[in-house]
């Protein structure tokens, strides 16, 4: 196998007219497993409108993943509780909005997906860093943070109330 004819990437080739051994990707080519044609899961929209529902079932595992990813990617700016008081603010950067303001509490979940995917204002896009499934998990965790800010005992299921000190 060592002594067989082959093209070594980034070395010149006399075979092709452009003299490159590494072939350019053909326009419109989609890598295997990367089609992402589910508008809700990968675009955060339903019929072109920001989604109001999650594309998957939100359970304890999704919430735990969302908390983990939120703490990694979001808390440096937004803080661990979503108040907009992360460590970058302490270093002089512009304060991001609190996740608890009415505008964001009332925003559809698709809005958060769009902002994480494409950026907004001073926030850069995170589509390349955070997988779509993880963006949805983060949104579920943000919704939990928002609910916790204004929760009452009536919001707690009766079976769980006895665990509250």
Regions found by a protein language model. Give the residues of each.
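Periplasmic c-type cytochrome electron-transfer domains
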Residues: 2-61, 130-141
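Flexible coil segments in periplasmic/lumen-exposed cytochrome c-class electron-transfer proteins
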Residues: 71, 88, 96, 103-109, ...
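Sequence/structural segment immediately N-terminal to covalent heme-attachment motifs in c-type
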Residues: 59-83, 89, 96, 111, ...
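A generic secondary-structure boundary signal that marks alpha-helix termini
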Residues: 10, 39, 75, 121, ...
